[in-house]
């Protein structure tokens, strides 16, 4: 029974101000729970369910009342304040056992704490990062409290017996619930599936398992008129006979008994009245006489039963009338006989149940109509049964050293600190260095979680480390958004049960309830793919670090190159893979001979070739001549970044955003890559009327067209968000060139890859972001190690051939060289890791309104004590207008998290007249 007096749930201000507790232990009478629901709101305070005894069940799911009588599933993330408990609504029921919470309590604490530190509603973050459990398989039932009168609430309401809650209006149930007149319970209701099963033979309807046939009956038991018909015999009578009568009597005496008066008269050649008079005078009497069975009966006795009288007559070669006479006389009759069970039924008995009638038909080798007919006649039935566990990705086999070698202390060269890093080498060598640590922890009975930013990295990690679990006597699970909801639920069940202790997955795996988590590994921690593009816009490595700290688990950062923020950590740097780099420096053509034998001294900037330089063109021709493979990295999708009028330099732009429209030649469309607006290419310039357009900024479509002209007849493929050719021929080893965006790196490397070309590297540098050069360096490292064993020639076309991010790769420096240099620069300029950043975005449909609100926010920050170095801006965003909204930004820089929280607290002091959004640790500034 639930007892409360206030219907709408309210956010507790005390709970917002209170820090997350490490241990939560209150008596049931005092308990309030902080509950997150998957909505962009703060955690809500609810009283514990009526009669609940125990500690606050951190990480457990709970059913809570919601607006309009709706029931929602929430997650207990902390203890609320006991003040004002009597005003709170009670949670309806706890859906998980506190001994097996849906999320590890440490994860619940850590993730919620990170959301509060990031100035984000925890419900929004949980909605992004908890991939299953918000719609649990429970059946909600209600009943009236004994003695309660629910008639004032309506006619259709439950009585004192449990019944399904969905039979009643939710609002009426909620009204009765508020007054303590209703009991709720939630019973496990596992998913059901329809299956086709074979019925037991005795359960098959008699009409289906028997058939009506015509069967010969014993001849002696037939109607006497049929088997012993009366016959007329001559006897001595009294009285005189006429001559005709005497003739008839003499014939009968001579020829024996006759079956009828007619047969007698016919044989004696007299009329029927004559023989009848002889009989009347007593000179003939009727006596029964057995007759032999007719041929038709004998045939049926030997060959029967038959399906019908007509079939009998036809097979026996007699008239239907003869058959009717025998059946009417009881010499044959309809009988029921068991039929031979159909072969399809026997197959289903042995191999069933079948998922569908079609699957049954296919397995039994019959047509679907035959199977459907058997189902209709009752040989099979469609039933609901608990759904079987879904098939999960199979863990790969471990091909490395045995467990005893892996777990030897000498095999583990990684630091023992709480936070460490491992970078350099190729993916295989990094996994080989990580494997001893993972194997040792799994062998100790502890758990390991490995996060990957994208499907390509996830696929490599699963192949390289997934086999360690079986080696250590446990199981591994692959958890990502590519799995179905049922697969994710099954993995969650196995993890909660302790069957799985190694999880390798995407950001969705961060909240997996692994028992006794010892190590949380973040692969490629600097990858922008970890940044959620909507919702909370969380940067997953930041959340992972907070969760690892809350769980007291070690945090390992592993990748091709460390993020600059990771440089201060202790770690291991592997020797870099061999890289062959050739730079085409558009800015310094006379220096080209120094870069390699491919260039010529006479080249000028205009002669170098664009978007495919002469050097790259020569190499592509060699690829064609030798039947090899090449990959070209384009800076953008589509044909070009923009179209420009050659007369007045007018550039068609998006009507909703302050960006040029991208040109897609294959569709003859211009498209905005911010809002999706698209339109056809205008015939003339809107400004001057010029008919000619000039494309600027080559994309994948343009570069692919150039390659096709350069290499006629050679296979050319495209791979970007808009156009994805089938690369199966390349992966099978066939020659060709693929042109794509960074989506290429999500694919396995073609096996015979000989050349990689970066068509314009400056695109990654020409971004107003302090991380631009770091991204550029990471991209070059990833390209250099893309092939798992070979070192394809990497050709970089650029106007900045002496950029340090490129030079360290060209000169063979290790993976730490450039990030370490960048870290020293950031220390001087007060940027991460030596500062904490938060970007505040102010948006409004009116430009002046957005600008005024942004300035007011900056003034408030300065008024609260922020110094000039802590607040940069306001300034309009890099894209000043998106989807009709004008954007202004401020960048906050603080020395630590506490100071950043103080600055962000200013946002809560008033309303700003515009939409304000906070992005802590932004990935683009």
UniProtKB/Swiss-Prot annotation:
Pfam families: PriA_3primeBD, PriA_C, Zn_ribbon_PriA. Gene3D superfamilies: P-loop containing nucleotide triphosphate hydrolases. Keywords: ATP-binding, DNA replication, DNA-binding, Metal-binding, Nucleotide-binding, Primosome, Zinc. Zn(2+) 1 binds at residues 645, 648, 685, 688. InterPro entries: P-loop_NTPase, PriA, PriA_3primeBD, PriA_C, PriA_CRR, PriA_helicase. Zn(2+) 2 binds at residues 654, 657, 672, 675. Signal peptide: none annotated. It comes from the Bacteria. NCBIfam families: priA (TIGR00595). This is Probable replication restart protein PriA. It comes from Deinococcus radiodurans (strain ATCC 13939 / DSM 20539 / JCM 16871 / CCUG 27074 / LMG 4051 / NBRC 15346 / NCIMB 9279 / VKM B-1422 / R1). The lineage of its organism: Bacteria, Thermotogati, Deinococcota, Deinococci, Deinococcales. The gene is priA.
């Amino acid at each position: 029974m639930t007892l409360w007096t206030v219907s709408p749930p309210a956010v507790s201000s005390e709970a917002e101000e209170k820090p997350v507790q490490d241990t939560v232990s209150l008596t049931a009478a005092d308990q309030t729970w902080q509950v997150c629901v998957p909505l962009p709101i703060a955690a809500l305070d609810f009283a514990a369910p009526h009669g609940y005894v125990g500690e606050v069940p951190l990480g457990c799911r709970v059913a809570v009342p919601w607006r309009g009588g709706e029931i929602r599933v929430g997650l207990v993330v902390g203890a609320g304040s006991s003040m004002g408990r009597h005003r709170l609504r009670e949670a309806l029921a706890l859906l998980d056992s506190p001994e097996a919470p849906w999320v590890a309590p440490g994860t619940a604490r850590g993730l919620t704490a990170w959301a509060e530190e990031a100035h984000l509603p925890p419900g929004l973050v949980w909605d992004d990062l908890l991939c299953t459990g918000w719609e649990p398989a429970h059946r909600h039932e209600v009943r009236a409290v004994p003695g309660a009168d629910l008639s004032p609430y309506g006619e259709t309401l439950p009585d004192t017996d449990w019944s399904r809650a969905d039979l009643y209006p939710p609002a009426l149930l909620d009204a009765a619930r508020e007054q303590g007149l209703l009991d709720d319970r939630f019973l496990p209701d596992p998913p059901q599936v329809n299956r086709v099963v074979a019925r037991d033979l005795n359960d098959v309807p008699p009409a289906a398992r028997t058939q009506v046939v015509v069967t010969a009956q014993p001849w002696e038991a037939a109607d006497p008129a049929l088997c012993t018909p009366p016959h007329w015999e001559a006897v001595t009578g009294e009285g005189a006979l006429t001559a005709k009568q005497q003739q008839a009597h003499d014939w009968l005496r001579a020829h024996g008994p006759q079956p009828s008066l007619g047969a007698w008269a016919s044989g004696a050649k007299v009329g029927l009245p004559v023989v009848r008079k002889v009989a009347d005078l007593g000179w003939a009497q009727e006596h029964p006489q057995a007759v032999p069975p007719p041929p038709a009966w004998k045939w049926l006795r030997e060959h029967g039963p038959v399906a019908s009288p007509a079939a009998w007559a036809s097979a026996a070669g007699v008239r239907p009338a003869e058959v009717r006479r025998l059946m009417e006389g009881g010499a044959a009759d309809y009988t029921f006989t068991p039929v031979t069970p159909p072969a399809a039924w026997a197959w289903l008995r042995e191999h069933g149940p079948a998922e569908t009638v079609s699957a049954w038909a296919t397995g039994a080798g019959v047509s679907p109509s035959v199977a459907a007919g058997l189902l209709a006649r009752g040989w099979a039935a469609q039933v609901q049964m608990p759904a079987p566990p879904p098939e999960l990705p199979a863990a790969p086999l471990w091909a490395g050293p045995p467990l005893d070698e892996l777990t030897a202390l000498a095999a583990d060269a990684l630091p023992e600190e709480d936070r460490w890093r491992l970078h350099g080498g190729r993916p295989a060598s990094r996994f080989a260095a990580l494997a001893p640590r993972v194997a040792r922890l799994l062998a100790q009975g502890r758990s390991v979680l490995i996060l990957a930013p994208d499907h390509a990295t996830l696929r490599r990690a699963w192949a390289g480390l997934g086999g360690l679990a079986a080696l250590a006597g446990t199981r591994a699970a692959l958890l990502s958004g590519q799995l179905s909801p049922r697969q994710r639920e099954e993995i969650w069940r196995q993890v909660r049960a302790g069957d799985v202790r190694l999880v390798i997955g995407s950001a969705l795996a961060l909240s997996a309830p692994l028992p006794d988590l010892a190590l949380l590994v973040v692969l490629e921690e600097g990858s922008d793919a970890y940044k959620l593009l909507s919702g909370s816009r969380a940067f997953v490595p930041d959340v992972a670090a907070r969760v690892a700290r809350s769980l007291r688990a070690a945090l390992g950062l592993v990748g091709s190159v460390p993020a600059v923020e990771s440089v201060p950590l202790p770690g291991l740097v592997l020797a870099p893979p061999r890289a062959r780099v050739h730079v085409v420096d558009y800015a310094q053509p006379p220096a080209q001979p120094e870069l390699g034998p491919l260039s010529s001294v006479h080249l000028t900037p205009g002669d170098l070739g664009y978007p495919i330089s002469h050097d790259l063109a020569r190499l592509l021709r060699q690829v064609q001549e030798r039947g090899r493979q090449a990959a070209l990295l384009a800076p953008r999708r589509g044909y070009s970044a923009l179209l420009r009028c050659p007369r007045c330099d007018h550039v068609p732009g998006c009507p909703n955003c302050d960006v040029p429209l991208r040109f897609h030649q294959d569709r003859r469309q211009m498209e905005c890559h911010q809002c999706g607006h698209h339109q056809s290419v205008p015939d003339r310039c809107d400004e001057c009327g010029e008919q000619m357009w000039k494309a600027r900024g080559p994309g994948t479509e343009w570069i692919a067209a150039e390659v096709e002209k350069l290499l006629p007849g050679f296979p050319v493929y495209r791979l970007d968000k808009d156009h994805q050719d089938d690369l199966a021929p390349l992966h099978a080893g066939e020659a060709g060139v693929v042109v794509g965006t960074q989506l290429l790196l999500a694919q396995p490397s073609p096996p015979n890859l000989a050349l990689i070309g970066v068509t314009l590297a400056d695109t990654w540098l020409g971004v107003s972001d302090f991380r631009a050069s770091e991204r550029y360096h990471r991209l070059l490292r990833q390209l250099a190690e893309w092939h798992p064993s070979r070192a394809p020639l990497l050709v970089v076309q650029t106007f900045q051939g002496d950029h340090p991010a490129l030079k360290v790769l060209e000169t063979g420096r290790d993976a730490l060289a450039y990030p370490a240099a960048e870290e020293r620069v950031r220390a001087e300029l007060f940027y991460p890791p030596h500062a904490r950043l938060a970007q505040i975005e102010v948006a409004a449909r009116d430009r002046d309104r957005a600008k005024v609100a942004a300035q007011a926010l900056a003034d408030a920050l300065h008024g609260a004590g922020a110094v000039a170095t802590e607040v940069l801006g306001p300034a309009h965003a890099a894209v000043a207008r998106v989807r009709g909204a004008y954007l202004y930004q401020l960048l906050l820089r603080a020395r630590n998290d506490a100071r950043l929280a103080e600055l962000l607290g200013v946002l809560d002091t008033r309303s700003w007249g515009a939409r304000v959004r906070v992005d802590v640790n932004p990935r683009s500034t």
